Amino acid sequence: MRIMGLDLGEKRIGIAFSDPMGWTAQGHSILQRKGLKKDLSYLQELCQEFQVEKIVLGLPLNMNGTMGPKALETQEFARALQEALKIPVDFWDERLSSKSAERVLLEADLSRKRRKELIDKIAAVHILQAYLDGGSLGKDY
């Protein structure tokens, strides 16, 4: 089963895909956000191209596990995504995924500009790989 992983941001969406067996996550691209309709249209094209059967969306919970404004916005995006694409959407706790991605990029000794370009894609990989390794949060959020 091919799964798409997304790291949703205000300006960009990091995109990753699993291999066809659903074992490993690979970074794909970064979508510069251009409005909900255009974002959904692009993601739909990718889902068709890669024959995606499920989408995993990083859920930005607060450090104490509660949901703040960003998590609520993510849920709204997930509802729109599932309605438009007719593909199940699951959540994964993304706390510290961007920090983890930044650490990887720092260790790779990339420039600040290059790190900024890649961080969302790497965060999407971290979210998706964690999901593949550990199961899902389900629909409780």
Swiss-Prot record:
Compartments, as annotated in UniProt: Cytoplasm
UniProt entry keywords in alphabetical sequence: Cytoplasm, Hydrolase, Nuclease, Ribosome biogenesis
Enzyme class: hydrolase
Descriptive protein name: Putative pre-16S rRNA nuclease
InterPro entries in alphabetical order: RNaseH-like_sf, YqgF, YqgF/RNaseH-like_dom, YqgF/RNaseH-like_dom_sf
CDD domains in the cross-refs: YqgF
GO biological process, one term: rRNA 5'-end processing
Enzyme Commission number: 3.1.-.-
GO CC terms, sorted: cytosol
MF terms (GO), sorted A to Z: nuclease activity
Primary location group: cytoplasm
Function: Could be a nuclease involved in processing of the 5'-end of pre-16S rRNA.
Family assignment from sequence similarity: Belongs to the YqgF nuclease family.
